[in-house]
Amino acid sequence: MMDWNNKNVVYVGGFSGFGYQVCQMMMKKPMKHLIVCSRMENVEMLKKLQAINTSVKVMFVQMNIADYASIVKGVKQVIGHVGHVDVLINGVGGLADKDVETTVAVNLTGLINTTLMFMPYMDKTQSGHGGMVVSISSVYGLEPGPAFSVYSAAKHGGIGFTRSMADEHLYHKTGVAFMCICPAMTSTELMMNKRDMNWMKWVPHSEEMWKMVMDAKMQTPEECAVNMMTAMEQAKNGAIYICSTSGMKEITPTVYMH
């Protein structure tokens, strides 16, 4: 089970949706620091987080994970403040298939670069104490997403990265557990902004598929956050969880080579 006591937690993500809801829930834990890394600062949201628990120091570091130099600068600032990281939550996501490079950068390469740059400050054989990396993916990282194939491909890649980093040999060396959380359809700002079908017209034959996606029953960010916290509390290396209106469920991907 996860021990939150005196931990330095880094959340890389925005100030809306289930990621921010998770931050609110984590603030009730006996952490030492919560550092929010995002492209834009939201002073009011940071104040609301701090008000939940004045014993946990809330900090903000600007970081754009689609920009390698910004990640380098952001990680340096974080480590300058706290020295090491115990929990890293990769919570950035972007659904904009028309912009292939940005979609891949936000959902895959940014996640990889951010994780690898923080690893020396988590790895117990280097400057860290061990810990946990939690990457927020999507059910469309587990199954095809024909209405948004680029997004789906990037999320598949993120899960592949997580599973590879969770290798037992690496885990025993570094002390860093890796897990992935895959929310099902959630009524976040990311999804609600896509109700205008015009944005999908550049993808041939996608309108009907996208309508089916948007007509599906969605969980609220609050429901998703509760399930995510339950999953994180398990602190199980290599675990992949689906969070949906049905609750939280651990899944086991097929292994083809032994």
UniProtKB/Swiss-Prot annotation:
Keywords: Oxidoreductase
GO molecular function: alcohol dehydrogenase (NAD+) activity
PROSITE patterns tied to this protein: ADH_SHORT
Residue ranges of coiled coil: none
Binding residues annotated for substrate, in chain numbering: 138
Cross-referenced InterPro entries: ADH_Ceratitis-type (IPR002426), NAD(P)-bd_dom_sf (IPR036291), Sc_DH/Rdtase_CS (IPR020904), SDR_fam (IPR002347)
Annotated NAD(+) binding sites: 10-34
Gene3D superfamilies given in the database record: NAD(P)-binding Rossmann-like Domain (3.40.50.720)
Cellular component, GO annotation: cytoplasm
Active site positions: 151
PANTHER family in the cross-refs: 15-HYDROXYPROSTAGLANDIN DEHYDROGENASE [NAD(+)], ALCOHOL DEHYDROGENASE-RELATED
Family: Belongs to the short-chain dehydrogenases/reductases (SDR) family.
UniProt-recorded name of the protein: Development-specific 25 kDa protein
Species of origin: Sarcophaga peregrina
